[in-house]
Amino acid sequence: MESNSISLKDVWAKTDPFQSIMTHATLSGLAAQVIWEKLPEGVQEELACLLSITQEQGKAWLGYLVSLHDIGKVEELFQWQWPEMRAQMEKAGKKPEFADTKVRHERTTVAALNERIWKELGAEKSLRSFYAGVLGAHHQGKDGEGGSKHTKNSSFWNGLQAELEETMRHLFLKTEVAFFPPIEKPQKGPAGALLLGLTILSDWIASGDLFADAETWFDPEKTWAEAEQKVERFLEDSGLCSPDVDFGREFSEVWPNIPRNGLRGLQEDIEALFAETEELISVVLIEAPMGEGKTEAGIYAALQMARQWKKHGFYVGLPTSATSNQMVGRMRAFLALHGLEDTVRLLHSMAWLVDEDLPEMQFDTEEKAYAARWLLPVRRGLLAPYAVGTVDQAMMAVLMVKYGVLRLLGLAQKTLVIDELHSYDVYMSELIERLLEWCKALEIPVVMLSATLPPEKKAQMLSPYMTEKLSQDYPAITAITETGQVVVRKIGRTEKHSVVSVSLCPILQDPEQIARKAAELVQDGGCLCVLLNVVDQAQTVYQALKQMGFDGETLLFHARFPAERRQEIEAQCIRWFGKDKSHRPKKAILVATQVVEQSLDVDFDVMMTAVAPIDLLLQRVGRVFRHEDTPRPPQFQAPTLCVLTPRDSENYHDVYPPCLRNQSIHLLQDRTTIRIPDDMPQLVADGYDMTAAPPEELEHWMEHLMENEAMSSASTQYLIRSPGKGFSPMKTPESIQFDDLEQSGFLSAKTRLGPPTKRIVLLEEEAFRQLAERAKKVEGIRILDNLSKNEEKDLLKQSVSIQEKKLEGKQSSTEVLYGRKRLEGLLVLRGEQKDGTIFYHNMKLDHELGIRFQS
């Protein structure tokens, strides 16, 4: 048989069912062009600008580039892997000299384009290396070598590769002469990230079941429009694109439920800032006390910046999944005001319990597990126009995580809002700083919100945009334009001026005394919060309160409850202490950890709090006298804060550095009041200033600074390079340090520096036995991978996250089941039930107290 008996229509790209390389290449380029059309205009303009071409040329070039991503499959070692092709190759006399099952087609793609095809077309070395490198990274972290280059059949396969390139060039570029957009090193980072993200997304869509049978019907000359419509429908049905919405420019247009005469000072000032600033604004930082309407002002700013930069929508990143769950409800209510129901996606590892999934899609690609995770509803939220979730989801965009570029592509289409900026530690702040560098490079507008922010942290968060000394006005809005102009607007009118009574109470190490003090404070009625820094202490104080026979309502709230029980407690917390006063108890004590510190809209008459860094104490004050319309007992005329301190600080340990705790004590020991907001900026500045500390604290401060340095260094090992340092696609297993399995307890790429955690479910023996009967035994362990979606949900609702070290060496193979797929990383443990409590080694699960550990 003649050598030309194998044509491009015979060369396989997919095998089940068969799809030729010609069909897959064409559909991938077509999908890329449809995605391009659906991108916000700002992203089109930016990518075209980075490549120094027009938007029309950008669409053509993208289709051409993406269509060639699998050209490396046109190679003998790769084709030999499929038995049906093997027979055809033998018949045609094209049997390879040796076989290699580890051949990586994307490596062949790079070599074919960079070393031969594009070189022969006259492309400059730096350009062909860059563009080939983008395509070579579309399967991230795969090990193996490229195909054979110098064998007896090389010229035949090289000829087919050249034919494929020429066909795609005519189809997409519509020219005999190839052109290669010029690009300089500083632009290669952002351009490479966008091009790679678009390549991956296009490949996955072309590999989905939309086109599983495309070989039987797709013809570029006859059914091009039909294929385009399929991609468009998928993007629309998936919520991956949306029409540009004009939310208006006035605050009351954006928030139609807030009348013009009801605007708070901050809201008037943010509106004026955008009206008076002519340049495009790159970043806005809003610093204001609790209760000033920061969220509404932040969303207003986000939408104005999206309009300016021709982007669509926003991603709101928050510190925890609990705060995300709350915020998604607020954002859905907001978008419903504009007729955009059901458009907000929720993103965190357990989000699919809260957010209902859309129909699932199958993918015929070796990356189908990742394609499914990314293009099924929960994950693709970062690509959707409106999304809310943990800030980790955005931070992963700059970690060495598989397919992190898809996160950058998603963020590039919208405004990023980072809420509760004060709550992130040194390690997370380093990650956020790198994220902001990429935001600037990709023209992603950013809004940051904070109640209190130390000057040093403020400077760090704004350093990607400016280096000059910052104003310390408070409360204030700081905006930086695209040219680096800094606009600072001091908020002229604050709604809440209060004088908080503050006292130190040295009983932190005595749970019985804390319980007695709490009961005394509300003996004549009132709602009190006892806020402690560690779960064990909260459980002990709650038990002491119950044992002393307190005659009011009590509730314990912390993070070590199973997911469903935690949601119940959160709902009860809001029912009792939230905006609706109809269920507010006459007398109640909530014992809690930091879960009530952030974004929960609850209001207490008085608070007792364990000592913490000063900015966090001020944040906690925001939960006292929060609502003006709350009926209060006569003994509570002003907000009251009782700060619990240790008698023996040297032997007291919690989650905060001793020097910051002791600095708070030092700053408050001679005070009886704090004026909100007047005293806040100076207190926060002094709280983080070593020179304001007494001399005996110097050793603690030095330890703290060394720990900060170590945390800062730790973050760099996980970060991708700054955008200005060129394009560094993650192609090899060595360069991708981490997987992107959010379900696995917590992401293996560290967005937070701390002890590793595991998500566990404690089941009593009979429930465990029933589940174990359905488990598969694989390599000596029992795995759960065949449960229905509802069964998976029921199991995850019973799950709780604990430190991994608490489990070390305890579980035997007979008492543990390992979750897979959506349950990835989950451990199901067999416990023993006694009197409503489930025991497992030194751990016990109690309905009222949550998970407890016994020494």
Ranges and model annotations:
Residues E2-F247:
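Accessory nucleic-acid engagement/destabilization modules that flank
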Residues R249-E287:
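Conserved pre-motif I regulatory segment
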Residues E279-A302:
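Walker A/P-loop
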Residues H312-F334, L346-A351, P455-K457:
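Conserved Walker A/P-loop ATP-binding site and its immediately adjacent core
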Residues G339-A397:
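Inter-Walker segment of RecA-like/P-loop motor cores
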Residues L409-T415, H422-R489:
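Post-DEXD/H (motif II) to motif III coupling segment of the RecA-like Helicase ATP-binding lobe
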Residues K458, Q509-K581, F604, M608-S855:
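C-terminal helicase lobe and adjacent C-terminal extensions/tails of nucleic-acid helicase motors
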Residues E468-A538:
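Conserved interdomain linker/interface between the two RecA-like ATPase lobes of SF2 helicase motors
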